[in-house]
Amino acid sequence: MSMLRLYTRVLELLGKEARLGWILAGANLLLAGAQFAEPVLFGRIVDVLSGSPAAGPFGMTSTSPWPLLAVWVVFGLFTILCGVIVALQADRLSHRQRQAVLTGYFEHIMQLPLTYHAGTHSGRLMKVMLQGTDALWRLWLGFFREHFAAMMSLVVLLPLSLTINWRLAILLFALCIVFTMLTTLVVRRTFDMQNEVEAHFSDLSARASDALGNVALVQSFVRVDAEVQGLRFVVDKLLAAQMPVLSWWAVVTVMTRASTTITILAIFAVGIVLNQRGMTSVGEIVMFVSFATMLIQRLEQVVSFINSVFMEAPRLKEFFNVLDAVPAVRDRPDAIDAGRLQGLVEFHDVSFSYDGKRPAVEDLSFVALPGQTIALVGPTGAGKSTAVALLHRAFDPQSGIIKIDGMDIRGLTLASLRRNIGVVFQEALLFDRSIAENLRVGKPDASEEEMRLAASRAQALGFIERADRKFDTHAGERGRMLSGGERQRLSIARALLKDPPILILDEATSALDAVTEAKVNAALDEVMKGRTTFVIAHRLSTIRNATRILVFENGRVIENGTFDELLARGGHFARLAKAQFMTQDGSRIGQPS
């Protein structure tokens, strides 16, 4: 992405603030004109004081400095007032839009597929969000407060200076050319270097976030020194990449200062010669020295702006790369909200592949009637989780169709579909909030009585009541203030509180002890009545009462039947059952464990 295209996208993100942006641009143009008038008036006053008549206001010749001074005061007051208004509005625009873009970015990444999040470190996404929106804020603020006015000053000053004295104006053009050449040279030399610097920043953020997320592991294995040393290594590489960039921009600063001094001396030298030949006045020499001083300030602001865009470019590229990531599924324009569904689920020749090469699910077909419990078993990677992910549209199949109550799920809004499906994940997912807030994820308006009932059914009420703050107890980051079994029971209670017609249990009882598991299974047996339930299971003892069992292998269903039917066939499921029962408790096949 070119620098011009990059900055165009920065301005496009102004969105609803674009109208105010245009108003600020017009105000900056007026400011540029007013600021140009001040050196002109200064020069004319010098001419008057030195005994030469000068052009006064409204085209009149003035022999008194007072009218010129009065006009200067008017322009000065206008510049101050307009500058204050522009600065205030630029500040407000930048802050408002930063928060709007940050919110939009957050909403966007929350809609990206789980495969994207699995391959992208959460610390990197946070770093891209914060650094990207901060970069946008700095560029918007600088552009509308200073940099655009500086550019407009160049547009106004250079052409008008030619109309006053083209010989002295040539020196100003020469100064601009030198600035442009130096800036272009350094940008080209350091562009790749700055990209490398930002890559090291990303590594630094990811490594620090990774270590902090596994602090228990670091302390347990006495890895503090090793992790600190690893971080220092990344910091050293970052500094090694950063120093050459800083050196090049330091050279630009020195060279521009030198060219500035040379230009002012040249204006005096050429001005003296022209004055001696009667081709310019003392006032015009002073005027062009003021022009040069103003031009230098504006050029430095423009270079600062270019430097800002250049320095922020890698961060903004990362930011736009995330924004350009496409969600796996979207609502169709004609998608409907079907309300509460009955739970009749149909898969018809459904196939899906993550990489377009190896199918994760292939030609999957089955029907689950309302109230039935369908168990999905098989080795890791066989396609069980992919099948249920397709059901709640984490992805859409490449071929085939999935229906609920006879409707293609792609014709339902995502919100409508997912309101009708409750999921209990194998790893309990909790927010760093209170137990009540975590439970209300399932039903935002749930009363305390409803939460107590759901917690009781999930065998979670006991430990909640024992806590000092009951339902206001803080769960901690990822629920770390609770045990694994407690986290999982809250996850089950949350799904029960949601009360969906379709329930997905992904090894929902795997984190529970035997006694609690038995109680939760009894509660789940009761709550699954009247719901279509999909159970992903590795422990076959947990699915003995399933209506039907689908045995997966390499994305296909190789066996299909009840628990006893599959045992009687003596196939793949029977071998799994024999291996598990013999290793778990030594009971014979077919005997409840």
Swiss-Prot record:
This protein's source sits in the domain of life called Bacteria
Class in the EC hierarchy, top level: translocase
Q: What is its EC number?
A: 7.5.2.3
Positions that bind ATP = 378-385
Record has Transmembrane as a keyword: yes
Q: Where is the ABC transporter domain?
A: 345-579
The reply on keyword Nucleotide-binding is yes
Free-text domain note:
In NdvA the ATP-binding domain (NBD) and the transmembrane domain (TMD) are fused.
Which keywords does the record carry?
ATP-binding, Cell inner membrane, Cell membrane, Membrane, Nucleotide-binding, Sugar transport, Translocase, Transmembrane, Transmembrane helix, Transport
List where in the cell it is found.
Cell inner membrane
Question: GO molecular-function annotation terms?
Answer: ABC-type beta-glucan transporter activity; ABC-type oligopeptide transporter activity; ATP binding; ATP hydrolysis activity
Official protein name in the record:
Beta-(1-->2)glucan export ATP-binding/permease protein NdvA
Q: Name one GO cellular component term.
A: plasma membrane
Extract the SMART domains matched here.
AAA
Membrane topology per the entry is:
Multi-pass membrane protein
Q: Which PROSITE patterns match?
A: ABC_TM1F, ABC_TRANSPORTER_1, ABC_TRANSPORTER_2, NDVA
